[in-house]
């Protein structure tokens, strides 16, 4: 017999959105459904973001469904405070207001079959359930591409997930790798703090003026994510479809020569990186702003991954196992996508119960 009807793994924007709608459909938090979250506190991945990130400089954060009942909105939040603190605080009040009873910190290690049910194994035991909603996002699966000599580097390898503040790199020579907004944010923050900055990208950065940032372009990028998910393919990056907005701050950085990419280095040596032409740049640290992959290792026993590299998912539901839903996967990864998907997934769950 199942311990609960639904287990939601992850209490970020996607997990909380599903929980909100399950509660609206009169399921009881902590009984009919339980939420297991690995984080030490509220906020999902936001609680781990770097100190200098502000809501005004981050991708737009949409409100969770029902947040207006608390009189809260990220649109009116204080943009002088760290984004990590604002999001964590708002999510804490949200969980309390709706009585979601999130259990944390609990780390899920695997999900497997037991008869007709699923078992969610975690560091505090096992929970047997009829349905699992995976809402683990990507923060726990940072992606760092391999380059020759990586293991020989005597300096520090940092990733977006481990970067804390510019001060820890004061006076050092830093190479930032990546062509997205995180890489640009690091360069802007490190300017005047690091001793020397170099920007490495695999391809030229696609800067776009505001007039080029259309709704159609955003819809097309999300559609590409959806098509890949439905085909069971590895998910493309969003920035590859939308480009990077040329804001005033970014345009100024380009004009003064800060935001000028050099291309990609060929290999890494103990004290720096070597380029295709044989020239070398000394480095004390390399920041890999190279993105994340969906965190799905705990689902491996269910053998959902396709040969094409992804999971076959449509409207948040696994095509291979009707008991598995993936909130925040592919086209649902943004905050607005996660909110809409929460309602869609909750309705499908109710149809099964």
Please provide the spans of the model-predicted regions.
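Short, basic/glycine-rich phosphate-binding loops at helix/coil junctions
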Residues: 63-73, 228-233
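Flavin (primarily FAD) cofactor-binding/catalytic cores of flavoenzymes
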Residues: 2-40, 44-47, 52, 79-353
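Short glycine/proline- and charge-enriched loop/turn segments
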Residues: 68-74, 154, 306
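Redox-cofactor-proximal catalytic regions of oxidoreductases
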Residues: 41-70
